[in-house]
Amino acid sequence: MTRIDVYLTQNGFAKSRESAHRSIEAGLVTVDGVVIKKASFKVDETVEHDVVCTDALPYVGRGGLKLEAALDAFAIDPNGKICADIGASTGGFTDCLLKRGAIKVFAIDSGRDQLDFDLRRDPRVISLEGVNARYLNTEIVPDTVDIIVMDVSFISQTLIIPRLGQILADNGVFITLIKPQFECGREAIGKGGIVKQPRHRLSAVRRVTAACAENGLFLTNLIRSPIVGGDGNVEFLALYTKRNNELQERIISGVDYN
């Protein structure tokens, strides 16, 4: 018996196990007509199977699709820009920025050995592993950054936001993926870690926006992510700039939290 991710790689269905994992996570792998949801699924190689694997993701992680939606909705063009990706993980956001023409991306993550191998080798990517973004400074990111993107888990963004202003250009933009499950109190989180109540989702957006405003970053645009989180949570993509905006509450109120 062979793991499905290994089987896909060895038999030419995927170029690497990372690619196989992405296809599995996206629900793009079937064995005998059954969608495979786990890379640990075992295939009996002594039996002939009808295996289908579609590598339809344009980025190394599904997060790239979320950032793509934000860049389009907010009319932000990374072409020729210096960027920072906080919470880079496998590099979905970083990959999206590069494919949109970014000339340099600081890929920052507190973990290690997560960034896609091809991205590690890309000369435009500065991989900063084992870096706690709560202590981000100009020594860690020496360049003035045009675009900061952020997708962090298991920590409130409010602990990182105070560090952003020192590396962001005066005319720069900050795009963040707001995950209510990491911004709300325990009372808001239900079974499976899901935040179901619209009022709690709204509270999460307001909390992040308030933290940004306290640090000179103001909400300019906001959308509901077209893709839910891996755990099924509704998420939001927000755009902040250093330009004061008196319409923040109107922007917040214009989004569906149901």
Feature map (PLM): residue ranges:
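Core SAM-dependent methyltransferase catalytic element
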Residues: I227-Y257
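S-adenosyl-L-methionine
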Residues: F106-L159
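A short glycine-rich, Lys/Arg-flanked "PGG" loop and its adjoining helix->strand segment in the class I
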Residues: T158-I175
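Conserved SAM-binding loop of SAM-dependent methyltransferases across substrates and taxa
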Residues: T90-G101
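Conserved class I S-adenosyl-L-methionine
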Residues: N79-S89
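A basic, amphipathic helix-loop patch mediating RNA/tRNA/ribosome contacts
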Residues: M1-E48
